[in-house]
Curated annotation (Swiss-Prot):
Expressed in roots and siliques at low levels. Residues 147-419, 821-1073 form the ABC transporter domain. It comes from Arabidopsis thaliana (Mouse-ear cress). The gene is ABCG38. The chain crosses the membrane at residues 516-536, 548-568, 600-620, 634-654, 659-679, 729-749, 1167-1187, 1197-1217, 1249-1269, 1284-1304, 1310-1330, 1341-1361, 1387-1407. It is found in: Membrane. Keywords: ATP-binding, Membrane, Nucleotide-binding, Repeat, Transmembrane, Transmembrane helix, Transport. This is ABC transporter G family member 38. Belongs to the ABC transporter superfamily. ABCG family. PDR (TC 3.A.1.205) subfamily. PANTHER family: PLEIOTROPIC DRUG RESISTANCE PROTEIN 1-LIKE, PLEIOTROPIC DRUG RESISTANCE PROTEIN 1-LIKE ISOFORM X1. ATP 2 binds at residues 866-873. Residues 1-27 are annotated as: Disordered.
Length: 1418
């Protein structure tokens, strides 16, 4: 015992000694720090702003230049300041920053946004003009012309979006914008941020600190955060935010810091060195983007996926909720002073939404910034974070004022919010005609529907409204405007810095798409080898002009190959345009900064590619073997590659659409190549078309290369000059340098036009859904059951369960078998991404789901919940059988039997989060198509249609039945309409088990209630329904029966009943040691997420996954699974006699019906292809006018064959190129529908190829009739119809080739490259540039497998195969055809059958590829 006391005393002495030494060390460190800071304070302000005092490696403080701050030092500095120990680390950090400004009385800039009498209207067509079809596109064009010249009346209707709205968004107060869909929220946000869409008419006044929008640059003063997530899929999250930070710059941050340092020096104030260093790093070029990006990543909770690519629907990346946060982060990294945020919580769980809004609120309050945020379903705890609320309805402001007073106003209007009702939900539902009456609380007056206009009038006479008008009547004192508040410079950084940022981004994208560039280079090399082999040593002993012309054909093909190699720039450029347009609106950079880096990046690549091509072709063909000739030849072709890239980028910028760009690209190349001087010699060009010859860059390229070769020493005795003259080329050597100069100028011109188009043209096809007032009323009244369906508290749902079941039993009488699903120990893992391995993660596999078990039963509605990235969608994909990548372990049973995917697809439905549908069908047609293919074949047509009508009524889609689905974010249905249609598409399939991924995401409270009412009614019919859900309101959450709660890492932490008022869920978590009690009225869903975070686990010292696995609840669930897996006697597994619901013939009929509807409405494809056929026909008719009547010389025949080769060459290439975007646009829909077991791949494939036949025939007739008549071919029935037939079959096999190529390609870029190889090989062996008899014997066989050769054979021999007219050489045309081309008239039927066989072969390859290949990674 004595020994213990002595030891204890010694230990106490040692502890005191250590504590004393520690205090001495801290005092010494503080003295060193103060000395270093005093030294820094003596520096001039400019130097002081660029230097800081930090602790060095040796332990002492030293002065460092911020420019030399390394990555490790920057990270350490960031971690020191952003202390994560405190839950309120963000607020504490902001307060420390603000405190530093307050100590020197330095006021930060603030912005007060006012809007007075703001009106926004749009014009829209009414009637059939609103539904695009091939026919009415032409009719509308003519009507539009008639309207312009005032021959026809204007049939547009003016739609009012915002009606005389006025208000004030105050700095330092967080304002919430609420309103139902179509109320004008997005329009108001855009109008206030200075980004009103093109086509909308705006009147009224918007001011910032008393300054109107034209007095400063609103794009850089205010940040608008769109509800649509548009990002480059190949960039990581960090790269996306860093690029945004670079472009937006530091604003006035550096000037404010300099002023702060000056005042601190005057007052002898020494700041915290670490905070000082971080503030300086955040405004120093080269460091700002890193510091701010890391800060925003931490605030938004994106650190976990910072180095993961964003991805898209075809490329796996981050989750939908994470994408939404990236969209928000893009603006937060900038220096803007006012934020207008549109639906930033879509796809986020309620806990994450709360944390993000809380962080934004802290920023707004501490720095007096301005923010107006639109949310669809704000949970109560998030709603309470806001200071003010604006409620918008039908374009009228219903209320604007303090959040805590909003209920008082509606009580003044006679309405009262029930208990346990979310205020935000109540505020949105009260504007609905169907929901309003239940909140009426004035017994003295009978209820009458109160419109938004009436609410607005009531607000004006309320004291809140009078106070608002009084404030608006007093103008803002412009003298109080801080000079740094409003931005007056167009861009946030210098032009050079913006160019560098775009160049860096482009280099990253090129690295990520390196495979595409490698394949494109490989395409060029293969084509070069083909040309080199075909023209192998053609001029060993050139002795005639004919030899020279054959050789000139090699030059023509080489130039054509290089020109077409730039075609892949079309899809690559257009894919990036949506991001460009978004960033253009934000004034991130000038248009040339977007286009120029692509030219710079591809410049060395192009020169290397062309060098390899020239090495292959120059020596195999046998060009002049002197160094100057070789270098000059290479230089022209290298510049030709640059010209080609510039040309196709220019076409992409002009057309802005995949289909239209492919069409116009082919048209441009056809025009240019026709006037290259080879297809049609200069002497044969009509005088009125000589301008086209002189403006064609191809003419200068062909002339330069030809002059360089034929004026060389290899072509002696004037033979080279004779060859040039025979085709009308210039013979003077200076034409080489003229050609070189013309190439450089055309390249520069293309880039200038590209930049101008990017700067001034709007995004292609933008058209939003507009609901006219009468349609709104119809939407409100289409449900015949009226208010019996409109209860908004879930108690009303349960009160109606019996009634609903009875109603459903009477109406929805299509039978189904109730099924349950169990699963045990489900583990899902993927290969660890390369980006994560580069960060030091050594595991080969990344586990996303970790040993999950559970059971889903009929009549039980299960919520699958968890924070973003917990694995909710992943689990649903695994259970539904939609995963095609990764590694799945565990067991899945359906009603006790092992799950068989083919049978399971027949009895299950999956509502995907991304709402993937065919854009050119109407709502009703989409439902009819789904029911047609998925309901049992014994259901008659009448019953099926009645069933569809009832589903549409249930989900309130009747008012939208004739509306096109449209493209997401561009046209057609709104987000919430699209979501409801997704559910309806699955419900009409009458599934026994239904999976729903985020069914309420993107919906407002009322739409979410409609959806959940539908879901509840579906469950009550005895179906098994599982929903992932992010941010449910109390009402929605408590409509579920059971909860499957996941945490990060894919582990289950609660699987069981929710209970009345969430009692069982609350009881479970409150029973865990250390978990606090839920607050009265708090959302249980949000509370469950908040108390189970990883941070809470660290605080409590528990792992919730382990707690669950040790609980009685876990054991009960295991027993339940075991019990359900015990198959009862006489039970039978799900079995169907066929894999699909419908026969192959019915599948084909349904798919063909859908293709017919889509094609008839696909104006950019079919109307453009008809117009293209007419344009090309007229163009070639003019160029080759009356050429068919001339048959006196070989040159006449050559020119005529050249005209025919356009069908085989250019028209066919255009057809193959334009069909690719159409097919690939439907591919994602095909993956969803095939995954749902709707049809086999073969009926789908055959419907795709069959639907092309009538449209191709129409195109062939349009082109053929025009060309045939204008060129003047012989007017006999047989020759005319043969010409039409060979034109038709040549276009058709080319279209089938394009379809085939896209079916074996993961994306359009790869398809473009593969198509380039095929097109070049067909052109080389078509027999135009080098006829078959002139080919080497060992190569002639290839013409038999070349459709281009057969196509030209058929067109030529049908016209000239029986012509006995003698040529100037003495031989007849028939003899010339046989001797020169190898064509014989009696071979005509063989040619016809062969071309049909080629078409069928390409169809077979397409069908086979569609069946076995899947490029979607899930």
């Amino acid at each position: 015992m004595a020994h213990y006391r002595v030891s204890s005393e010694v230990e106490n002495i040692m502890n005191r000694d250590r504590s004393h030494r520690k205090n001495e060390e801290e005092d010494e460190e503080e003295a060193l720090k103060l000395a270093a800071m005093e030294k820094l304070q003596r520096l001039p302000t400019y130097d002081r702003a660029r230097k800081a005092v930090l602790k060095g490696i040796t332990g002492g403080f030293k002065e460092i230049d911020m420019k030399d701050l390394g990555l490790a030092e920057r990270r350490e500095l960031f971690d020191r300041v952003m202390t994560m120990d405190d839950e309120d680390w963000h607020g504490e950090y902001l307060r420390r920053l603000k405190s530093r400004f307050d100590r020197v009385s330095l006021h930060l800039p603030t912005i007060e946004v006012r809007f007075e009498d703001l009106n926004v209207t749009a014009e829209a067509y009414a009637g059939s003009k609103t539904v695009p079809t091939v026919l009415n596109s032409y009719v509308n064009l003519l009507k539009g012309i008639g309207t312009k010249i005032r021959v026809l009346p204007d049939r547009k209707k003016r739609i009012s979006i915002l009606n005389d709205v006025s208000g004030i968004i105050k700095p330092g107060r967080l304002t919430l914008l609420l309103g139902p869909p179509g109320s004008g929220k997005s329009t108001l946000l855009k109008a206030l941020s200075g980004k009103t869409e093109t086509g909308l008419r705006s009147t009224g006044k918007v001011t910032y600190n008393g300054h109107e929008l034209h007095e400063f640059v609103p794009e850089r003063t205010a940040g608008y955060i769109d509800q649509y997530d548009v990002h480059l899929p190949d960039l990581t999250v960090r790269e996306t935010l860093k690029f945004s930070a670079k472009c937006q710059g530091v604003g006035t941050g550096y000037d404010m810091l300099a002023e702060l340092l000056r005042r601190e020096k005057d007052l002898n104030i020494k700041p915290d060195p670490y905070l000082d260093a971080l503030m300086k790093a955040s405004v120093i070029k080269g460091h700002k983007e890193y510091v701010v990006t890391d800060y925003v990543l931490k605030v938004l909770g994106l650190e976990i996926c910072a180095d993961t690519i964003v991805g898209n629907h075809m490329k796996r990346g981050i989750s939908g909720g994470q994408k939404k946060r990236v969209t928000t982060g893009e603006m937060l990294v900038g220096p803007v002073g006012a934020f207008f945020m549109d639906n930033i919580s879509d796809g986020l769980d309620s806990s994450t939404t709360f944390q993000i809004v809380k962080s934004i609120k802290q920023m707004i309050h501490v720095f007096d910034k301005t923010a107006l945020i639109s949310l669809l379903q704000p949970p109560p705890e998030t709603f309470e974070l806001f200071d003010d609320v604006i409620i918008l309805g039908e374009g009228h402001i219903v209320y604007q004022g303090p959040r805590e007073d909003v209920l008082e106003f509606f009580e003044f209007m006679g309405f009262k919010c029930p208990e346990r009702k979310g205020i935000a939900d109540y505020l949105q539902e009260i504007l609905s005609k169907k929901d309003q009456e239940q909140y009426w609380a004035n017994p003295e007056l009978p209820y009458r529907y109160v419109t938004a206009k009436k609410f607005e009038e009531g607000f004006k006479i309320h004291h809140f409204g009078r106070a608002m008008r009084s404030q608006l009547a007093t103008p803002f004192d412009r003298l109080k405007n801080h000079r740094a508040a409003l931005t007056r410079t167009t861009y946030g950084a210098s032009k050079l810095e913006l160019l560098k940022a775009c160049l860096e981004r482009e280099s990253i994208l090129m690295k990520r798409n390196l495979r595409t560039f490698v394949l494109k280079s490989l395409q060029l090399i293969i084509n070069a080898i083909l040309i080199g082999v075909v023209f192998w040593q053609q001029k060993n002993y050139p002795s005639t002009v004919e030899d020279g012309i054959i050789y000139m054909g090699a030059i023509y093909l080489e130039v054509q190959m290089i020109v077409f190699s730039g075609f892949f720039e079309l899809p690559m450029t257009i894919d990036k345009l949506p991001v460009f347009y978004k960033q253009r609106h934000f004034s991130f950079y000038p248009s040339w900064a977007f286009s120029l880096p692509t030219s710079i990046i591809t410049f060395p690549l192009s020169f290397v590619e062309v060098f390899i091509v020239v090495l292959i072709t120059y020596f195999t063909i046998g060009y002049d073997l002197t160094v100057p000739s070789f270098l000059k030849h290479y230089l022209v072709l290298a510049l030709c590659g640059q010209m080609s890239y510039g040309l196709f980028r220019c076409i992409a910028a002009v057309t802005r659409n995949h289909v239209v760009s492919n069409t116009m690209g082919c048209l441009a190349v056809m025009w240019l190549m026709t006037f290259s001087g080879y297809v049609l010699s200069r002497n044969q060009v009509h005088k009125w078309l000589t301008w086209a010859y002189w403006t064609s860059p191809m003419m200068y390229i062909q002339t330069a290369v030809s002059v360089n070769e034929f004026r060389s020493e290899s072509w002696k005795d004037g033979l080279g000059v004779a060859v040039l003259k025979s085709r009308g080329f210039f013979v003077e050597t200076y034409w080489y340098w003229i050609g070189l100069l013309a190439l450089i100028l055309s390249t520069i011109l293309s880039n200038i036009i590209t930049s101008l188009c990017l700067a001034f043209l709007k995004q292609y096809g933008i058209s939003k859904t507009a609901v006219l007032p009468d349609e709104r009323e119809e939407a409100d009244s289409n449900n015949t059951t009226g208010r019996d369906y409109t209860g908004t508290t879930m108690e009303r749902f349960f009160d109606r369960v019996v009634t609903t079941r009875t109603c459903n039993d009477k109406k929805l009488r299509i039978p189904f078998k109730p099924l349950y699903m169990t699963f045990e120990n489900i583990t899902y893992s993927v290969d660890t991404p390369k980006e994560m391995k580069e960060k030091g993660i050594r595991e080969n596999k990344l586990v996303l789901l970790n040993g999950l078990s559970g059971a889903f039963r009929p009549g039980v509605l299960t919520a699958l919940m968890g924070v973003s990235g917990a694995g909710k969608t992943t689990l649903m994909d695994v259970l539904a059988g939609r995963k095609n990548t990764g590694y799945i372990q565990g067991e899945i049973y359906v009603s006790g039997f092992p799950k068989k995917q083919d049978s399971f697809a027949r009895v299950s439905g999956y509502c995907e989060q991304s709402d993937i549908h065919s854009p050119l069908l109407t709502v009703y047609e989409s439902l009819l198509y789904s029911a047609w293919l998925r309901l049992p074949p014994d259901i008659d047509t009448h019953t099926r249609e009645l069933f569809i009508e009832e589903v549409m009524e249930l989900i309130e889609l009747k008012a939208l039945r004739e509306m096109l689905v449209g493209y997401v974010g561009i046209s057609g249905l709104s987000t919430e309409q699209r979501k409801r249609m997704t559910i309806a598409v699955e419900l009409v399939a009458n599934p026994s088990i239904l999976f729903m991924d985020e069914p309420t995401s993107g919906l407002d409270a009322r739409a979410a209630a409609i959806v959940m009412r539908t879901v509840r009614n579906t469950v009550d019919t005895g179906r098994t329904v599982v929903c992932t859900i992010h941010q449910p309101s109390i009402d929605i959450f408590e409509s579920f029966d059971e909860l499957f709660l996941l945490t990060r890492g894919g582990e289950e932490i609660y699987v069981g009943p929710i209970g009345h008022h969430s009692s069982q869920l609350i009881e479970y978590f409150e029973g865990i040691r250390g978990v606090g009690k839920i607050k009265e009225g708090y959302n249980p869903a949000t509370w469950a997420l908040e108390v189970t975070t990883r941070a809470q686990e660290d605080v409590l010292g528990v792992t919730f996954a382990q707690v669950y696995k040790k609980s009685n609840l876990y054991r009960r669930n295991k027993d339940l699974i075991k019990e359900l897996n015990n198959i009862p006697p006489h039970a039978q597994d799900i079995h169907f006699s066929t894999k699909y619901s419908q026969s192959y013939l019915s599948q084909f009929q349904a798919c063909l019906w859908k293709q017919h509807k889509s094609y008839w409405r696909n104006v950019p494809y079919n109307a453009v292809r008809f117009s293209f056929g007419a344009a090309v026909g007229i163009m070639y008719g003019i160029i080759f006018w009356s050429l068919g009547k001339r048959k006196g010389t070989r040159q006449d025949i050559f020119n005529s064959v050249g005209a025919m080769s356009t069908v085989v060459g250019f028209l066919s290439s255009q057809s193959a190129a334009t069909v690719r975007p159409v097919v690939i646009a439907e591919r994602t829909v095909f993956y969803r529908e095939a995954g749902a077991g709707m049809y086999s791949a073969l009926p789908y494939a055959f419907s795709q190829v069959i639907i092309e036949i009538p449209y191709t025939m129409a195109q062939a007739c349009i082109y053929g009739v025009i060309v045939y008549g204008m060129i003047g071919y012989e007017w006999t029935a047989s020759k005319f119809f043969l010409n039409i037939f060979f034109t038709f079959i040549s276009i058709l096999y080319s279209i089938y080739t394009g379809i085939m190529v896209i079916s074996v390609s993961p994306n359009q870029e790869i398809a473009s490259i593969l198509n380039g190889v095929i097109s070049t090989s067909w052109n080389v062996f078509s027999g135009f540039t080098i006829p078959r008899p002139r080919m080497h014997v060992w190569l002639r066989w290839f013409t038999y497998v070349c459709p281009g050769w057969w196509g030209l054979y058929g067109l030529t021999i049908a016209q000239y195969g029986d012509v006995e007219t003698r040529l100037d050489t003495g031989e007849t045309v028939v003899e010339f055809m046989k001797n020169y081309y190898g064509y014989e008239y009696n071979f005509l039927w063989v040619v016809s059958l062969t071309l049909i066989a080629f078409s069928m072969f390409f169809v077979f390859i397409y069908a086979f590829s569609v069946k076995i290949l899947n490029f979607q990674k899930r």
